[in-house]
Amino acid sequence: SQVTTYMMCSGSDFFYVRSKYGHVMGDDLNGTLDCGCDTAQYNSFRKYYRNHLNLEKEGTDLVAYTLKRAKEKGMEAFITYRMNDLHFNDTTTHCPIWYTDFWIQHPEYWLNDTTQGYNSGGAFDFAIKEVRDRKLAIISEQLENYADIIDGYDLDFMRFIVYFKSGTGPQNAPLMTQLVKDIRQKVDEISAKQGRKILRSARVAPTVEQNMMKGLDIREWLRLGLLDFISTGVHWRGDPAMPVAKFREEMGKELNIPFYSSIDDGGYRPREFWSHGM
């Protein structure tokens, strides 16, 4: 095919392989976590964890294996990291096996703003330093673990594009810019150790205004040289009228790196088009 770059999602606060920052997705911690009466959901999570254990016994790291396979097929191999995944932070499900360690242990770090769509009340609040520090630590761990494999690291800000309380995005944008700078510094450190350049990319919203509303000052990121390429997209549902030309026009000469726009495809019930944030 004409595909040249393969990106594997490494999750967010749940992990597909062992991490010092939390347990593997589906681990019920020796039977101490369940999913209430929803045995189907519980069994689904447990199935993933059993598969993980089987691979682990064979010495197979799921992320490493997948990235190596992509490189064997002649593609660039990237990790793409969900910056604030909201799938697993709904306490009304009464399903503890869904909850990540750091999230359930620190409700004081929740955004508590339900106006931004799906599960946004339980989103991590990036205005809090401890949240940003943890994200940097997780990303740093992945960079170190897969430094000899990856060609690049992608920050997926569209999963989910909720970072600050409504109306406070622009004033908090410098905090997110500093986080991206810190990640860039870590990537550069790993690149120097490897003796080769590891690329940095980000997936963001389709317009400059939408990004700034959410605290993502992409103009400043490019001015500071924090990214090697950028992509725009929507959250899950496809948009046949993606404003690619508008993005180019808004960015002007500041768009000095390769720019891609994604094709997204997903099904929603009618009410979800707006409840899911975009």
Tell me the role of every PLM-derived stretch.
Residues 164-168, 260-267, 272-277:
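Aromatic- and carboxylate-enriched substrate-binding clefts and catalytic-loop regions
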Residues 130-258:
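Active-site neighborhood of glycoside hydrolase catalytic domains
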Residues 11-16, 56, 205-213, 232-243, ...:
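Acidic-and-aromatic substrate-binding clefts and catalytic sites of carbohydrate-active enzymes
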Residues 24-26, 95-98, 219, 248, ...:
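Short, hinge-like loop/turn segments at secondary-structure boundaries
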Residues 8-12, 80-84, 155-158, 203-205, ...:
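Active-site-proximal beta-strand/loop segments in catalytic clefts of secreted hydrolases
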Residues 31-68, 72-73, 78-141, 271-278:
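Active-site-adjacent "subsite" loops/lids of carbohydrate-active enzymes
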Residues 1-58, 231:
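N-terminal substrate-binding region of glycoside hydrolase catalytic domains
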Residues 17-22, 82, 88-95, 166, ...:
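Short, solvent-exposed loop/turn and secondary-structure capping segments
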